[in-house]
From Swiss-Prot:
HAMAP family: Ribosomal_uL4_B. Part of the 50S ribosomal subunit. GO terms for molecular function: rRNA binding; structural constituent of ribosome. PANTHER family: 50S RIBOSOMAL PROTEIN L4, LARGE RIBOSOMAL SUBUNIT PROTEIN UL4M. The gene is rplD. InterPro entries: Ribosomal_uL4 (IPR002136), Ribosomal_uL4-like (IPR013005), Ribosomal_uL4_dom_sf (IPR023574). This is Large ribosomal subunit protein uL4.
Length: 200
């Protein structure tokens, strides 16, 4: 299949990567796994055995008229432990390479179908100036966009860093979450070829 390139000849790409049927369940599973992996999972509370103090019985078992109590750190008490205390845990989920590649291909194919993937021959800024990048994006009528280049472009990265709903990455920096987070994805022809090789 062919991808239209702005200001250049069409680019021949693999249908297996850019013309695949959308697998919603797979994309959902991979995106959820990414979100789960981003969780810190460092929350912690203390159970009755971990709260400091509470060794002595507060009052004798019988004869006071009060409810019996064995420790002041019971979960029923104020300053007591937590009944089912939260502990640090790893929320990450395993994503197989085949699943990851399948999700990426599904997303890229859907971007092509929805005409949200824009391919240009080359895209860069001469200096790390946000103003320069804004002008370039205005020319292309883009405001909510992920810019993907073949190589790391320091100037482009610095120019995009302070812009709302604009991000610049190289091919190694893209993932399923970043591809669906923006309204449009702007890729250089070089980046398209690299993505194709990466997902082959």
């Amino acid at each position: 299949m062919e991808l239209m390139v702005k200001g250049a000849a069409a680019l021949t790409v693999s249908e297996a990567t850019f013309g695949r049927e959308f697998n919603e369940a797979l994309v959902h599973q991979v995106v959820v796994a990414y979100a789960a992996g981003a969780r810190q999972g460092t929350r912690a509370q203390k159970t009755r055995s971990e709260v400091s103090g509470g060794g002595a019985k507060p009052w004798r078992q019988k004869g006071t008229g009060r409810a019996r109590a064995g420790t002041i750190r019971s979960p029923l008490w104020r300053t007591g432990g937590v009944t089912f205390a939260a502990k640090p845990q790893d929320h990450s989920q395993k994503v197989n390479k085949k699943m990851y590649r399948g999700a990426m291909k599904s997303i890229l194919s859907e971007l092509v179908r929805q005409e949200r993937l824009i391919v240009v021959d080359n895209f860069s800024v001469e200096a790390p100036k946000t103003k320069e990048l804004v002008a370039k994006l205005k020319e292309l009528e883009l405001n909510d966009v992920l810019i993907v280049t073949g190589e790391v472009d320091e100037n482009l990265f610095l120019a995009a860093r302070n812009l709302y709903k604009v991000d610049a990455r190289d091919v190694a920096g893209i993932d399923p979450v970043s591809l669906i987070a923006f309204n449009k994805v702007l890729m250089t022809a070089d980046a398209v070829k690299q993505v194709e090789e990466m997902l082959a």
